[in-house]
Amino acid sequence: NDLDSLCCSMAFSSKGFVEAGKLASDKLEEALRIASENGKHPVLCDMSPCLYTMKSNFGERIKLYEPAEFATQFLVDKLKIRKLNRKISLFAVCSAKKMEVEEHLKELAELCAEEVVVIDSNCCGFAGDRGFLLPELNKHGLRNIKEQSAGCSEGYATSRTCEIGLSKHSGISYKSIFYLLEEATRE
């Protein structure tokens, strides 16, 4: 209940609102504990940065997964995937790297597209929502992306804010890896 008010807490804690962050995190953890029946069911979080925050704050009871990790562990063996004839760009966001799940992203992309270009960058520089206020961080973090993604028709990642900056600086549209999986399984 009241799902639209739930938040991983990063928006609060990253700005120094520790108490508000703890309240938001505790409220989300309790809601997910109930929804997952005390960890009986896995929980998918579509944003890697939010998942990283949740994993840092929550106890061990709830099984939390990021998009590509969830797809490779629970979906791909149940789906009929056809490899799309295109060259795509792939960006593993910072939090996915910190959780060491970027290989799931690459594995999923390679199941869905003929050619996958993995962007070589440690960080896009968007830094949560800081890219809105300090766009030069994002511009600097992605200063080489246009060359690296040359010839790619589109790009995929696991963080909407990162995807905003990636789209702006690469010249191609970036979106969730789930869009690629959906298209590769469409009949």
Residue ranges and their predicted role:
Residues 1-187:
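Iron-sulfur cluster-binding electron-transfer modules in prokaryotic oxidoreductases
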